[in-house]
Amino acid sequence: MSKEARELKDYYLTKEFEDKYNYEGSLGAKVDERGTVIRLWSPIAESVDLRLYDNGSTGEAETIIPMKLCDKGVWEYSVNENLSGKYYDFALKIKGKVRISTDPYAKACGVNGKRSMIIDLNTTNPNGWEEDKAPLKGAEDIIYELHVKEFSYDENAGFPENVRGKYKAFTVDNTTLRNEGKLPTGLNYIKELGVSHIQLLPVYDFASVDEAGGEDGFNWGYDPLNYNVPEGSYASDAARGEVRIREFKEMIQAIHNKGLRVIMDVVYNHTFSLDNALQNSMPYYHYRLDAKGELSDGSACGNDIASEMPMTEKYIIDSVLYWCEEYHIDGFRFDLMGLLTVDLMNKVQKALDETYGRGEKLIYGEPWTAAKTHMEKGAKGAVKDNVKLLDENIGIFSDDIRDSIKGHVFYEEVAGFVNGNLKQTDKIEEGLTSFGLSPNHIISYVSCHDNHTLWDKLTITTGDEAERRKQNKLSAAIYMSCQGRVFIYSGEEYLRTKNGEHNTFNMPIGLNKMDWELTEKNKDMVSFYKELIGLRKEMTGLCDKSKTAKDNITTFVKEEGLLGVKVANKETSLVKPVYKEALIIFNANKEEKTITLPEGKYKLLINTVKKNNERDDILVSDKIKINGITALFLGKM
């Protein structure tokens, strides 16, 4: 198998193959008033039969139709009939053997993605869909990472039983904790927090949850099956292919109506297994192989997508553009972006910019891999070392600021700046100005769905709860003061815990769900995050994404565990700053420190550790005392 696979790959890499078979046209099934057209790219197939079904998962094919081979290795079937609602797959004869495949370009499918579905997408649009559009961009991109099922599964969140864990939950307005009408939950809570974007963990069709199973099934969803179809387990009916599409659109519409944008987490670096449409229709074209013909495994998931191959590159770009066009998606978070090529990422950004305007769609990802990968054609991966080769608007998660703040994510006992490792002071200073990179390149964060929650990490390194609370506030104050875009993991603001588990991708929903009662228990922390987010949006010196943004920040005091910077805030088209100059001071020492301030009078804006009965309108000059494990924000009068 390995030798045969390598021989196939080498053939695909020849100039002869590329010149003869690289194809730029549309693929998949399309239905309009003229009829139905289905196209599949498979240059090595000897024959292809289209098999049509009435059912999405059971029963024999009602019709089997030989497809016509056209130019560029494209197989086509067209008919002057609207076949919307029919399910289908392909029987391909390759090297004398018949392979059954769904459609790589499927836009709908049956339960568990076993069969593709022909669909007239216009029939899936909710009322008002044509008028749906992204809200205007604000002063800062502040991203809130969220899992569809976790969002609404808690019975105390106030959602009706029939929508808990579903797309439909996002359409339920004015939910409150325990239905008491007091503390908001759901989208109203997120809107009040002050963020600008919701990033949804994978919502394409993934293979790790049985869509025909019970409601307890849970997975993060990093197991792609059908890249261009919404996941069915979040729909009210996974068996009817049109339902998940309509309900997904209703979710997007509801989020937009709240003034929030939507970012989609996409996993174009690997698939759940090789039993999928990409492999079955075109063996080993879309996957990386080493010199011996073995599958490359830089994803630690058993396979790596070969994004350097021209038709794979086309597939990914087509997919991204499709989600924007059909579902009004506002941006993409690329999982293990380091496994994708620099060329691909720049082409994705270019395609989005040309279609929607420069920077309108937000693009960022993880600039690392899980292991070494085998790229062909001299391709370069979109890893951290190659960030300067990426389009300026493509962001990367800053593991440097993350680990400097709280400690290493893989060595749980290793502390960061806030929990005792004062040697990280220089790193914190560098992080405030994006480590010398354009701020557009940096996603500033301290926690996400991966690894321990912030609260759980601090619990490992610090025994005293009161001290942990100070550390949590200081952590948030630091990463929200860094130039770049801000990223918050859902629940971080209410001290979300997963009971010390660091990898809950397939653990019970009871552990993973958002615990909405913690918003009441820790409402002081939620209020602090709101205040911090609000101040961030007013500080144009931090929101600045220009190449000269670093000039807005100057250090006025630095010693081990102590850092004070001055921020220059200029008026922009969106914000007229109340304070044209502000001071931010971090003290990670346990002891109180006295600091000499730059000349002038300052109003205390935020003190993460207030003394009893301390007023909010304190004016200071000359010197100020800062408590241990504290951040101060001051505005110059």
Place the predicted regions along the sequence by residue.
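Structural beta-strand segments of beta-rich domains
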Residues: R34-I38
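Substrate-binding/active-site clefts of carbohydrate-active enzymes
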Residues: K149-Y327, M337-Y356, L362
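Conserved, mostly hydrophobic/aromatic
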Residues: L40, F90, L146, I190, ...
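C-terminal beta-strand-rich structural cap/linker in extracellular carbohydrate-active enzymes
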Residues: S42, G85-Y88, D617-M637
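Loop/helix patches that line or flank the sugar-binding groove of alpha-linked glycan CAZymes
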Residues: L437-Y602
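Glycine-rich phosphate/pyrophosphate-binding loop
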Residues: A108-N156, I396-A466
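Active-site-proximal helices and loops of the catalytic beta/alpha 8
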Residues: G59, I64-I65, L69, E215, ...
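The feature marks proteins involved in alpha-glucan
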Residues: M1-E33, E62, L69-V172
